[in-house]
């Protein structure tokens, strides 16, 4: 790990950056510095503000307040082209390559002739110790090599600030180590690297400096060696309210004709040997009132499984039963009528009608049950019930849903799902992009829904969130269930080991316990 001289002028210096969307402060007076040859890790839960900060540095978003210095010079009105010219390159979590173009064509794409130097490109590859076939189609590369092509696109453009967003999310341990070797080579070339990750062991292995964001601010910042894993986890994890919902906030279950009133040991949903697009051999069950966590890295097949259960993707083989009745061949609308409801990950494109009113959105799943025509008086009653039950903040029921904050949009989506009378509710990344106050509201709401004997499948990439919420966890790895954890076994380290295929569940639990005992 490189030890930098603090007298060296920073490559990047961010001071007092603030930003708000729809009245919600997503960045609050952020200070952030990157030195030459430094790997500065950035961590934080979903909605902490990491992506917004990086988009501002890369010129994709404009700050409301604050200043940015690059190589000691103040810059303003950044856009992506200007950021590239100043040496800043953002490498997204999912590489954005042209799959039908060659590796060389992708690296040199849209470069002016004086920069499209093939000899220099080959020299950079040699410096990094890479063995890429420049003539191969980019679509034929594995994810690790695709990310390397993105790194090369930055370097060939003379970038000295590289921003890597969750670069190891879909990599095997061997691919991760190869990437780290190449990043250390870049350190020796005085390239500064912002490394966004939620994997704390990787941070200790790689980074010189660490900053943790929470609720739009910097909760911790300093030399990585000065902080333990527990220090970082405490900085990341939001402080839960641990306050039960009021009687008014529980009103949805009293008024909404909840179909499942009593507890039962019989599973309400059973899946047997299910195969589909992106997953295989899935067997699971969930009981009324149970929160079943579904964990795994990006690409593990969690969302594909959820969409298949809901009928959005085809079943290749296997069986799905809801309340002991086969639904494998039923269409989505039929599964919905039977009580299987899905709250999708992307609320903007899949869950909500952004330009439509609150009332239309909340009642949209049940309009066909009452004929397709809207009933304003009835809809107003429904909206008012959920306003009180979920503490939704809005001005008028005809207000377009896109004008609400992210947290209130998510509550509208939850209300829409509850109005469909779920027996099973599949929730995919429910707190992505919402602020800390709304996040804690949503945690409490999900617990309350489960208390009404609704079975919940809870999908989240935020492992602390999974630990906090789930009664039981299934961990997916490369499209299969790699392990099951009971409530007593659930912790972040164990989930991570299983999610990356290092251990099966029982082996992971015993290994983690041994490691913790040895460190005491």
UniProtKB/Swiss-Prot annotation:
Look up keyword Translocase and say if it applies.
yes
For this UniProt entry, the molecular function terms from Gene Ontology, in alphabetical order, are: ATP binding; ATP hydrolysis activity
Q: What are the record's GO terms for cellular component?
A: plasma membrane
Q: Name the reaction it catalyses.
A: ATP + H2O + (2R,4S)-2-methyl-2,3,3,4-tetrahydroxytetrahydrofuran-[AI-2-binding protein]Side 1 = ADP + phosphate + (2R,4S)-2-methyl-2,3,3,4-tetrahydroxytetrahydrofuranSide 2 + [AI-2-binding protein]Side 1
Keyword annotations of the record: ATP-binding, Cell inner membrane, Cell membrane, Membrane, Nucleotide-binding, Repeat, Translocase, Transport
> Which residues are listed for ATP binding in this entry?
44-51
What protein is this chain from?
Answer: Autoinducer 2 import ATP-binding protein LsrA
Q: Tell me the lineage of the source organism.
A: Bacteria, Pseudomonadati, Pseudomonadota, Gammaproteobacteria, Enterobacterales
Q: Which gene encodes it?
A: lsrA
């Amino acid at each position: 790990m490189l030890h930098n001289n603090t007298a060296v002028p920073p490559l990047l210096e961010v001071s007092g950056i603030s930003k708000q969307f729809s009245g919600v402060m997503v960045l609050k007076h952020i200070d952030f510095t990157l030195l030459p040859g430094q790997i500065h890790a950035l961590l934080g839960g979903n909605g902490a503000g990491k992506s917004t900060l990086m988009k501002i540095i890369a010129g994709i978003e404009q700050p409301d307040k604050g200043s940015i210095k690059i190589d000691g010079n103040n810059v303003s009105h950044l856009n992506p082209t200007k950021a590239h010219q100043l040496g800043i390159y953002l490498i997204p979590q999912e590489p954005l390559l042209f799959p039908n173009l060659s590796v060389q064509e992708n690296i040199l794409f849209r470069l002016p002739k004086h920069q499209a130097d093939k000899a220099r490109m080959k020299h950079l590859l040699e410096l990094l110790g890479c063995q890429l076939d420049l003539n191969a189609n980019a679509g034929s590369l594995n994810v690790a090599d695709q990310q390397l092509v993105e790194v090369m696109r930055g370097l060939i453009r003379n970038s000295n600030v590289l921003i890597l967003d969750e670069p190891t999310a879909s990599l095997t341990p061997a691919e991760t180590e190869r990437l780290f070797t190449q990043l250390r080579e870049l350190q020796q070339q005085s390239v500064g690297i912002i490394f966004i990750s939620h994997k704390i062991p990787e941070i200790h292995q790689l980074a010189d400096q660490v900053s943790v964001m929470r609720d739009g601010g910097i909760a911790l910042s300093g030399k990585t060696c000065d902080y333990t894993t527990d220090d970082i986890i405490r900085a990341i994890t939001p402080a839960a309210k641990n306050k039960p919902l009021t009687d008014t906030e529980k009103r949805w279950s009293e008024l909404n004709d909840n179909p499942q009133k009593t507890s039962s040991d019989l599973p309400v949903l059973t899946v047997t040997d299910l195969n589909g697009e992106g997953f295989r051999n899935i067997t699971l069950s969930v009981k009324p009132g149970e929160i079943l966590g579904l964990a795994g890295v990006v690409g593990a097949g969690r969302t594909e499984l959820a969409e298949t259960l809901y009928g959005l993707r085809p079943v290749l083989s296997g069986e799905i039963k809801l309340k002991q009745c086969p639904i494998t061949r039923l269409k989505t609308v039929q599964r919905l009528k039977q009580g299987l409801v899905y709250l999708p990950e992307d609320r903007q494109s899949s869950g909500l009608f952004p330009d439509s009113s609150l009332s239309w959105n909340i009642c949209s799943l049940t309009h066909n049950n009452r004929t397709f025509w809207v009933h304003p008086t009835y809809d107003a009653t429904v909206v008012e019930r959920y306003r009180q039950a979920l503490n939704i903040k809005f001005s008028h029921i005809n207000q377009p849903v896109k004008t609400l904050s992210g947290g209130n949009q998510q509550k509208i989506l939850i209300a829409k799902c509850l109005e469909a009378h779920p027996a099973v509710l599949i929730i995919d990344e429910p707190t992505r992009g919402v602020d800390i106050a709304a996040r804690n509201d949503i945690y409490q709401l999900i617990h309350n829904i489960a208390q009404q004997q609704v079975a919940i499948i809870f999908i989240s990439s935020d492992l602390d969130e999974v630990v906090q919420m789930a009664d039981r966890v299934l961990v997916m790895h490369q499209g299969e269930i790699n392990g099951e954890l009971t409530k007593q076994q659930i912790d972040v380290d164990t989930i991570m080991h299983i999610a990356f295929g290092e251990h099966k569940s029982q082996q992971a639990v015993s290994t983690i316990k041994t490691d913790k005992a040895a460190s005491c």
